[in-house]
């Protein structure tokens, strides 16, 4: 490769490959920045560049410090940015010794301090030129505490601890290159070293608001540091002469316009400040005050003044009648209150009473006001109506200078007619007939003269009041039809009578079928027990055998044949101890059989003891595991709890019921059930088919293989198919015992989720010192989908197919499909080659590209020392 190829005038990146590590050399128009390095103390490809402006060591591990140490030995000043504290001692031959030497060389350079995190995210200027541009470094993570942890690990000399400290406390930064030309795009590089994915996510989410150039896909050089434009505030327009605010000076500078009479009499606004009578008031509308000026209360509120002297021009919402002249008398108050009468009632029924007549003339309230006469209502015929007044109306209610109103009286609810007997005890009370009512004097129809009426007004009748009961008079000589029978209580028990002891089913005389039997007669029992016995008409004669004619009974000199066995009275046979008869083939009762089933308590106790032994053995095995102190304590408590639960009455009863359900010796299958529990099968006797899922496996397996019954081939096929499917599902999962977290231990890490997408030009996938991607497929998909970069450096050593597929799935989530993405793998593998061949169409559809791995790209550099070949990949950034 010719030397002029190295001196490029275009921003690019050289991805340097090696057997143990990778590094990145950035070329920003001749400004070189080295990110990382190699373990060998050899500058390598960096020796062919002109000058290195700075070295960034985000993870100061042993695999990164060799190149930096070789560059410092050349004697040129080289700023090295790493987050470490001053070393006191370092172990010889360790990474701490090299870091201490780098720190001593760096201390001789002016104004080179270790970059530390600042919540304000200031820009650390690395290079600045008016002809080329500005190179800045923003620190997102890495403070004093992180520096102490890394320094302690380096001083200890344990490289494993150094790598762990670099992953958890390493420096994370953003490198920003702003070209001198304002219309060119900036270059954004994520510097993460070997930091974990969670640390990267937390750092970016915190810096999202302070670094606005990370929130858009493309940023110009002039807009890189500009904030989001705030909403424009409208400026106040220059006021016109008619829109100037009212003056508040003491002397009037211009004459006051004549007052315009108000169209109506609106309610005057009051002001807390006293208004001066000599201060003039302008009639022009005030212009709205600017936003910055705060108007005072005195200028906003209208000042009180007499309506005849200084009326103000106010907008009237609706046109109304003009105001009356000054000499005209004011309208009466009754007319102004016409729209609001004192009371109004609506007629809801027939009116009982005369129509209200015109009111009496009332005294005027004042000389200036006089009530207008109300229209007189038409007179009605007084013969058909009556007036019934309520107590709530008084004569004073009609002398209140208000408008006349209609009096509506609601008639009471008529009571139902009663059929009462004429009372003879009160002859002085007379009944008013309809004719007397018609001859009654006419009622006064003038409501105003009600006070002069001397007639007594009957009190109003409450229609909702329940009438009081009146005692019914006792009228002698009435007919039987007028008598009302007293109500009869249907639930009252009647009084006892003489016939209460009468029982219709109890005979009062002896039954004819049960006569008195003489002592010398025979009673013959009938076959039916419900029928009465039959009494023979002959007396009983005890049988007596006579010589050879045994079995013959002579009754009244006649011989009768007696059946065998009935020569003597029948004596019942006594039962045995078990409740059965001696000469009877009676089966043993079921109750006795159940009592015999409970005799196997010894076997149940043995099975229970065996189960407890199994639990004890399991707890002992768990205690023998090599666990830490907290987990061992947790397992010990769990095993003790299992042993206690196994001895509970509920557990023993459950085990007994399971054993009994599989069969017992009383049913003839005890031997088969016992053989099935011990793992053996008796082929001579067929095991009955119980519930298929109840007795498929043994109750206690004793650590041996489970023995299944071979009586249902169809069910065996189903179980085998399920087992095969479960093996396929669990093939990718290791057979590890997942114990719950011990009390006090750290909870499992939650999946990493970025708050929003971020845009870069170069990023490196989180990796470890072995050049392997340190995140799983889910984390890699989240990283690619949210950290959207044009160029992605992928540590592809021993990468899996799931991780490669996660990169493709993450790229598919980008909203801007035209935004390209170039993946630069560091190592080649058959998995990577096969993935590239199978997904060529998907790459083209999603604008994704996989370049040739770095280890497959060779570049030769010719110099005076000769030609040297390097593993590197060059990628343009602009």
Swiss-Prot record:
Signal peptide: none
Segments for region (Disordered): 224-425, 456-518
GO terms assigned for molecular function: actin binding; microtubule binding
Keywords: Cell projection, Cytoplasm, Cytoskeleton
One GO biological process term: axonogenesis
Location(s) in or outside the cell: Cell projection, Dendrite; Perikaryon; Cell projection, Axon; Cytoplasm, Cytoskeleton
Residue runs in coiled coils: none
Compositionally biased intervals (Low complexity): 241-268, 278-293, 310-321, 328-339
Keyword Lipid metabolism among UniProt keywords: no
UniProt feature, compositional bias: Basic and acidic residues: 416-425, 480-496
Keyword field contains Cytoplasm: yes
Broad class of the protein's primary localization: other
InterPro entries, A to Z: MAP1
Cellular component per GO, a single term: synapse
Tree of life domain: Eukaryota
Family statement drawn from the similarity comment of this UniProt entry: Belongs to the MAP1A/MAP1B/MAP1S family.
Subunit record text: Interacts with dlg-1.
Protein name, per record: Microtubule-associated protein homolog maph-1.1
Organism (species): Caenorhabditis elegans
């Amino acid at each position: 490769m010719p030397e002029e190829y190295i001196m490029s005038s275009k921003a690019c990146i050289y991805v340097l490959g090696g057997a143990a590590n990778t590094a990145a050399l950035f070329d920003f128009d001749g400004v070189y920045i080295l990110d990382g390095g190699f373990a060998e103390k050899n500058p390598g490809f960096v020796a062919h560049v002109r000058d290195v402006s700075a070295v960034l060591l985000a993870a100061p591990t042993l695999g990164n410090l060799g190149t930096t140490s070789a560059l410092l030995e050349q004697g040129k000043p080289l700023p090295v940015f790493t987050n470490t504290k001053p070393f006191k001692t370092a172990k010889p031959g360790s990474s701490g010794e090299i870091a201490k030497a780098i720190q001593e060389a760096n201390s001789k350079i002016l104004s080179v301090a270790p970059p530390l995190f600042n919540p304000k995210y200031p820009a650390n200027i690395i290079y600045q030129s008016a002809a080329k541009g500005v190179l800045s470094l923003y620190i997102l993570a890495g403070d004093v505490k992180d520096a102490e942890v890394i320094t302690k690990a380096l001083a200890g000399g344990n490289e494993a601890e150094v790598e762990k400290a670099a992953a958890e406390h390493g420096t994370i930064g953003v490198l920003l290159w702003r070209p001198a030309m304002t219309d060119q795009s900036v270059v954004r590089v994520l510097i993460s070293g070997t930091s974990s994915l969670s640390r990267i996510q937390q750092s970016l989410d915190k810096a999202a608001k302070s670094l606005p150039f990370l929130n858009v896909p493309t940023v110009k050089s002039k807009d890189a540091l500009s904030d989001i434009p705030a909403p424009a505030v409208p400026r106040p327009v220059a006021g016109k002469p008619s829109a100037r605010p009212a003056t508040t000076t003491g002397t009037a500078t211009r004459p006051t316009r004549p007052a315009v009479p108000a169209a109506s009499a609106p309610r005057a606004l009051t002001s807390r400040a006293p208004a001066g009578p000599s201060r003039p008031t302008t009639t022009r509308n005030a212009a709205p005050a600017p936003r910055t000026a705060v108007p005072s209360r005195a200028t906003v509120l209208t000042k009180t003044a007499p309506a005849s002297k200084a009326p103000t021009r106010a907008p009237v919402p609706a046109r109304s009648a003009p105001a009356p002249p000054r000499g005209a008398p004011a309208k009466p108050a009754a007319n102004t209150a016409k729209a609001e009468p004192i009371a109004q009632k609506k007629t809801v029924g027939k009116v009982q009473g005369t129509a209200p007549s015109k009111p009496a003339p009332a005294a005027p309230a004042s000389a200036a006001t006089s009530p207008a006469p109300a229209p007189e209502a038409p007179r009605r015929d007084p013969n058909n109506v009556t007036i019934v007044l309520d107590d709530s109306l008084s004569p004073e209610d009609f002398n209140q200078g208000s408008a006349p109103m209609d009096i509506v009286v609601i008639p009471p609810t008529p009571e139902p007619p009663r059929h009462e007997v004429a009372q003879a005890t009160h002859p002085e009370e007379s009944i008013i007939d309809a004719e007397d009512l018609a001859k009654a004097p006419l009622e006064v129809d003038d409501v105003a003269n009600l006070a002069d009426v001397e007639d007594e007004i009957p009190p109003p009748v409450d229609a909702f009041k329940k009438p009081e009961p009146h005692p019914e008079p006792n009228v002698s000589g009435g007919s039987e039809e007028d008598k009302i029978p007293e109500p009869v209580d249907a639930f009252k028990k009647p009084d006892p009578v003489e016939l209460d002891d009468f029982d219709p089913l109890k005979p009062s005389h002896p039954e004819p079928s049960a006569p008195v039997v003489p002592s010398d007669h025979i009673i013959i029992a009938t076959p039916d027990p419900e029928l009465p016995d039959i009494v023979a008409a002959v007396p009983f004669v005890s049988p007596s055998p006579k010589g050879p004619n045994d079995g013959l009974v002579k009754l009244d000199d006649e011989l009768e044949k007696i059946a065998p066995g009935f020569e003597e009275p029948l004596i019942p046979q006594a039962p045995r101890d078990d409740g059965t008869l001696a000469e009877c083939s009676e089966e043993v009762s079921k109750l006795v059989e159940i009592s015999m089933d409970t005799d196997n308590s010894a076997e149940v106790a043995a099975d229970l003891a065996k189960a407890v032994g199994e639990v004890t053995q399991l707890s002992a095995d768990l205690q023998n595991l090599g666990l830490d102190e907290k987990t061992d304590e947790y397992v010990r408590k769990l095993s003790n709890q299992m042993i206690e639960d196994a001895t509970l009455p509920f557990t023993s009863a459950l085990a007994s019921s399971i054993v009994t359900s599989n069969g017992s010796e009383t049913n003839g299958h005890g031997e088969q059930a016992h053989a099935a529990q011990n793992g053996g099968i008796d082929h001579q006797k067929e095991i009955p088919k119980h519930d298929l899922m109840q007795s498929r496996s043994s109750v206690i397996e004793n650590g041996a293989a489970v023995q299944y019954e071979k009586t249902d081939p169809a069910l065996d096929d189903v179980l085998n198919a399920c087992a095969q499917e479960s093996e396929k599902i669990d093939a990718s999962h290791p057979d590890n015992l997942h114990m719950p977290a011990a009390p006090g231990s750290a909870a499992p890490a939650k999946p990493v989720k970025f708050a929003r997408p971020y845009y870069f030009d170069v990023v490196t996938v989180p990796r470890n010192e072995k050049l392997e991607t340190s995140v799983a497929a889910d984390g890699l998909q989240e990283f690619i989908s949210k950290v959207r970069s044009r160029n992605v450096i992928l540590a592809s050593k021993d990468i899996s197919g799931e991780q490669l597929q996660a990169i493709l799935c993450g790229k598919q989530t980008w909203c801007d499909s035209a935004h390209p993405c170039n993946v630069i793998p560091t190592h080649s593998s058959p998995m990577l080659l096969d993935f590239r061949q199978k997904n060529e169409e998907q790459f083209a559809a999603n604008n994704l590209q996989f370049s040739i791995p770095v280890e497959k790209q060779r570049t030769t550099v010719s110099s005076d020392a000769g030609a040297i070949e390097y593993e590197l990949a060059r990628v343009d950034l602009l």
